[in-house]
Amino acid sequence: VWLRAQHSPLAVWHEDIKQWQLVDSWQQLHDIYGSYKTNSQKSVCLYFPSSHVLQVESELNTAQLKQLGMSGKQYLFEETSLTPVEQLAIRQVTENTSHHLYALAQSDIEAWQQSAKLAGMNIVALLPDFLLLPTPEECAGQQIVLYQDQQTMLLRQSLHQGMAVSYLPLIFERFPHLSEVLLLPAIDDIFDDSSTVFHQASNNGLAEN
């Protein structure tokens, strides 16, 4: 399930037919899909707006990060977080010698979980929605993947890095070596020309993760 903006319709990915469907709310999601499984509570993976997540690529090594502990990792986000750092949930992804830290306000997590719970659903995974975009083939700042629709604008620059975009010209200034932008079709366009745009969206990798 993809929540593109805080109050936007939900987008639901159908793996069997490789297509998105829009629903207005969690309750409508339950009404439509409630009979798909017999268990009382349905499990969903929620892709939330990337604007809610903070990211830090730490230069500390594994031992130093372990010594910091959870509270120490929270304070790595002190300069960028509007939420008190004690109220941040932290996740760490390590690739080779690189350590990527992600922070999300606990209040956001609880709000999404509560919305799903009221509709009889259970969120089992939370992921920033830039991960729906395919990974650029050139990840040294030379190529980025861009997605835009009426609800959001997203950018992915590498396997573990991406963001919500508010003003595109400023973003381009951050990538002085940029040579290629891969633009994905909006999922809203699928409903205008499903035979063409849906095929492009599937082949380009949106929601293939």
Indicate where each model-derived feature is located.
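Hydrophobic/aromatic-enriched cytosolic interaction surfaces used to assemble or bind macromolecules
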Residues: 1-209
